[in-house]
């Protein structure tokens, strides 16, 4: 049996590979997406005081640091049996939504959209952020980078550091927002809203007005019919920070809803021998293997899942969400390329929410931390990360020292559907007597990019470093320097 390997996988966070197995006729028999980074953080956290964990887990991933910090801080509330103050909750939500703007922007422009804007079969040297800017215009590129920095600035103001935050504490937040800071955040939020509107306009001008790309988005070989999991508030609107975790089936019917550690009653994880990452599924439906379609127990999380489950909680984003359903003519939407569209909708939603919270008079209250209670020995923090539902679950001894940790991240939730998506694409494009080249294989690679894979988060990589070698050549082609991290 012939084997094709795509390694490294490109334009994603972390390191993984795709293994495609062909039968004797040259058709695809099977395909696997493998995360090759080793799982380590859950063991590493044991022995730490719970109040140190939020700062520590932010180092799991430099891109996803804000969500691990926030989910872990929520879990630490449970360990100390404390309900954060309303102001603290709003600051945390403000922080999380600013991260959404920063993250969704980076994923769309640097990782997801180059395939569509530059071209799926374009030279890989051009099919990137720089190539995208050449296509949409330097002025647009400058505007995007400037307005994305507005979100980074808010993250630095609230989190204490732009990359690995330190402000989250059990029961609240370590620093209040002054009136001057509130005004600055409000001004920055208005720039973020403009970024959201611009992104949806770029999506419409470049993709929706192109019939071939629209056909690609709605192609059956990029369609994975599974269940969905996401978080909504009591009114059924999407909420990234808090609410009910809701599971729906392939037709959009609610299967269950839960909060906190009840997740153990609804989500099970299956270990497979070829990956360091487990395969979650809806527990009450039982493991049915790597199959999609009605009756499957597999599910997806993330922007498209959230849009399928609940309505956007801000006006402009709600209007954009409704347009997506109108154009694609289904809800729930199962076309995986629509993840990019849903991500653009959420970028605007998060920006609008940052502006709403910045204009909330309670956001500057000095009441940012509640008094801690007795150590309960267990805490669960669940939020919606940009990539999807994120669960941090800790157990401690009577002194608040971590004895056990379980982290279920978005890429883990999506692991099985990603494998199905890759296999479907491979079976469609790799066939008997067909030349296999880089252009063709990119049609397989674009099947995983909508999920915004983060390998480091999924494997909780430790030490989080992949062997890397950089060769520097001069203008004459002579090797002048070699840089290694191993």
Curated annotation (Swiss-Prot):
GO terms for molecular function: nickel cation binding; oxidoreductase activity. InterPro entries: Ni-dep_hyd_lsu, NiFe-Hase_large. Its EC number is 1.12.99.-. Ni(2+) binds at residues 61, 64. GO terms for cellular component: cytoplasm. Its main location: cytoplasm. The F420-non-reducing hydrogenase is composed of three subunits; MvhA, MvhD and MvhG. It forms a complex with the heterodisulfide reductase (Hdr). Part of a complex that provides reducing equivalents for heterodisulfide reductase. This is F420-non-reducing hydrogenase iron-sulfur subunit A. It comes from Archaeoglobus profundus (strain DSM 5631 / JCM 9629 / NBRC 100127 / Av18).
């Amino acid at each position: 049996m012939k084997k094709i390997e795509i390694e490294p996988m490109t334009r994603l966070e972390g390191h993984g590979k795709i293994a495609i197995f062909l039968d004797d006729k040259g058709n695809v028999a099977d395909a696997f997406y493998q995360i090759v980074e080793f799982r380590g953080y859950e063991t590493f956290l044991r022995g730490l005081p719970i109040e140190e964990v939020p700062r520590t887990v932010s180092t799991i991933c430099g891109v996803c640091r804000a969500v691990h910090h926030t989910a872990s801080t929520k879990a630490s509330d449970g360990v100390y049996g404390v309900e954060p103050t309303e102001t603290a909750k709003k600051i945390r939500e403000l922080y999380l939504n600013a991260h959404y703007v920063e993250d969704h922007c980076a994923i769309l422009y640097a990782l997801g959209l180059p395939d569509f804007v530059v071209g799926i079969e374009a030279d890989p040297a051009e099919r990137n952020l720089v190539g995208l800017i050449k296509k949409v215009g330097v002025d647009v590129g400058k505007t995007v980078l400037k307005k994305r920095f507005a979100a980074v600035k808010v993250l630095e103001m609230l989190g204490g550091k732009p990359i690995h935050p330190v402000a989250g504490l059990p029961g609240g937040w370590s620093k209040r927002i002054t009136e001057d800071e509130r005004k600055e955040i409000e001004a920055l939020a208005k720039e973020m809203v403009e970024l959201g509107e611009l992104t949806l306009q770029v999506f419409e001008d470049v993709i929706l007005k192109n019939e071939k790309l629209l056909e690609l988005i709605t192609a059956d070989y990029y369609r994975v019919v599974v269940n969905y999991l996401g978080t909504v508030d009591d009114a059924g609107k999407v909420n990234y920070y808090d609410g009910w975790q809701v599971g729906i089936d392939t037709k959009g019917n609610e299967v269950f809803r839960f909060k906190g550690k009840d997740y153990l009653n609804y989500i099970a994880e299956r270990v497979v021998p070829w990956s360091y990452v487990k395969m979650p599924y809806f527990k009450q439906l039982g493991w049915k293997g790597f199959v999609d379609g009605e009756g499957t127990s597999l599910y997806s999380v993330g922007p498209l899942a959230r849009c399928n489950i609940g309505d956007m909680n801000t006006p402009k984003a709600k209007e954009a969400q409704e347009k997506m359903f109108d154009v694609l003519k289904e809800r729930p939407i199962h076309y995986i390329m629509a993840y990019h569209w849903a991500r653009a909708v959420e970028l605007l939603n998060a920006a609008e929410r940052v502006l709403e919270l910045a204009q909330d008079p309670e956001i500057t209250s000095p009441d940012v931390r509640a008094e801690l209670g007795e150590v309960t020995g267990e805490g669960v923090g669940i939020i919606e990360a940009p990539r999807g539902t994120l669960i941090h679950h800790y157990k401690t001894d009577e002194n608040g020292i971590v004895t056990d940790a379980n982290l279920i991240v978005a890429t883990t939730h999506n692991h099985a559907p990603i494998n199905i998506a890759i296999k479907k694409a491979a079976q469609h494009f790799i066939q008997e007597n067909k030349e296999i080249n880089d252009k063709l294989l990119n049609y397989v690679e674009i099947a995983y990019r909508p999920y915004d894979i983060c390998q480091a988060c999924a494997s909780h990589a430790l030490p989080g470093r992949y062997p890397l070698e950089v060769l520097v050549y001069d203008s004459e082609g002579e090797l002048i320097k070699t840089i290694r991290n191993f």
